[in-house]
């Protein structure tokens, strides 16, 4: 999947994906399951976030969203795990081959 979707379902809840010019505290992205949203920043520290980085950020925030929905708050708070897992997921999804 090379495109960031507008929405998806996680645990029976529709999660809306918003591309924003900037996110407070200069984050690349953030998710809030309670508000059913994932936000991805176009800019970070005053610089444009390249599309491949936005896509990786989408998978990073999706990983948080899934773990939070599962009640795995400690694992979701482990940024090393989330970053590593989401990078592998992003790579796998973007290199899918079909016959």
Predicted regions: what they are:
Residues 72-99:
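Post-HExxH zinc-binding segment in Zn-dependent metallohydrolases
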Residues 48, 65-66, 75:
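Short active-site-adjacent helix-start/loop capping segments
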Residues 19, 42, 67-69:
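Residue-level recognition of conserved beta-strand positions in structured domain cores
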Residues 1-9, 16-39, 48:
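Catalytic zinc-binding patch centered on the HExxH motif and its immediate surroundings
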Residues 56-68:
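Active-site recognition of the HExxH zinc-binding catalytic motif
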Residues 34-57, 72:
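Short pre-active-site segment immediately N-terminal to the catalytic Zn-binding motif
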Residues 31-32, 65, 84, 90:
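Generic recognition of cysteine residues
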């Amino acid at each position: 999947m090379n495109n960031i979707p507008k929405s998806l379902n996680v645990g029976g809840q529709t999660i809306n994906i918003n591309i924003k010019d900037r996110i407070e505290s200069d984050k690349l992205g953030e998710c809030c399951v309670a508000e059913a949203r994932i936000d991805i920043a176009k800019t970070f520290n005053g610089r444009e976030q390249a599309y491949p980085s936005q896509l990786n950020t989408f998978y990073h925030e999706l990983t948080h969203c899934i773990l939070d929905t599962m009640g795995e708050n400690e694992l979701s708070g482990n940024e090393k795990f989330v970053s590593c897992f989401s990078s592998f997921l992003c790579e796998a999804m973007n290199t899918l081959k079909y016959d």
